[in-house]
From Swiss-Prot:
It comes from Arabidopsis thaliana. Intracellular vesicle trafficking and protein transport. It is found in: Endosome membrane; Golgi apparatus, trans-Golgi network membrane. SMART domains: RAB (SM00175), RAN (SM00176), RAS (SM00173), RHO (SM00174). This is Ras-related protein RABA2a.
């Protein structure tokens, strides 16, 4: 939503991180928002979020990133947090095939609960573990194309492509919001003129000219 010029940001975008437990969602969050990485990061309990303000397409955007727990017992809790999300990063671990296989389940849940226009990016994390890779880049790319998702591989440990991933999804969200704003403004303007109504511009201008610029009290 647009903010007044005197506030510190123009837009607030909510983005959710989803995927199985242990795929590195929390470290992607901390790397992007604080440029930190914790080797002994524990599984998120419930829901956490962090923010970062940055420039997107020349506008100041406050990104509110929600880190949702991947454990089954928290699924009912986290489903409520899909509401209001404009973007989603669906993360799997390139060293664990099961986490990639479960992507379709996460995607279905996301599409069931989130806005139909939500921007979704598939992320293959932990590319630094090259010797343990078990999910081919080509397979993930093919799946992403089939489902209409953008795709990127990252390493939160090495800070590889993390910034690019968030910048890409935020830019896409901004483009969609911008189009909606323009469309909304046009709709509002058109709504003020009833179908078939004739407006006498000259009469309106003359009427306005006769009105005093201020009233005395």
């Amino acid at each position: 939503m647009a903010r007044r010029p005197d506030e510190e940001y123009d837009y607030l975008f909510k983005v959710v991180l989803i995927g199985d437990s242990g795929v590195g969602k929390s470290n992607l969050l901390s790397r992007f928002t604080r440029n930190e990485f914790c080797l002994e990061s524990k599984s998120t309990i419930g829901v956490e979020f962090a923010t970062r303000t940055l420039q997107v397409e020349g506008r100041t955007v406050k990104a509110q990133i929600w880190d949702t727990a991947g454990q089954e017992r928290y699924r009912a809790i986290t489903s409520a947090y899909y509401r209001g999300a404009l973007g989603a990063l669906l993360v799997y671990d390139v060293t664990k095939p099961t986490t990639f296989e479960n992507v379709s389940r996460w995607l279905k849940e996301l599409r069931d609960h989130a806005d139909s226009n939500i921007v979704i990016m598939l992320i293959g994390n932990k590319t630094d573990l090259k010797h343990l890779r078990a999910v081919a880049t080509e397979d993930a790319q093919s799946y992403a194309e089939k489902e209409g998702l953008s795709f990127i591989e990252t390493s939160a440990l090495e800070a590889l492509n993390v910034e690019k991933a968030f910048q890409t999804i935020l830019s896409e969200v901004y483009r969609i919001i911008s189009k909606k704003s323009i469309s909304s403004d046009q709709t509002t303007a058109n709504a003020n003129i009833k179908e078939g109504q004739t407006i006498d511009v000259a009469a309106t201008s003359e009427s306005n000219a006769k009105k005093p610029c201020c009233s005395s009290s």
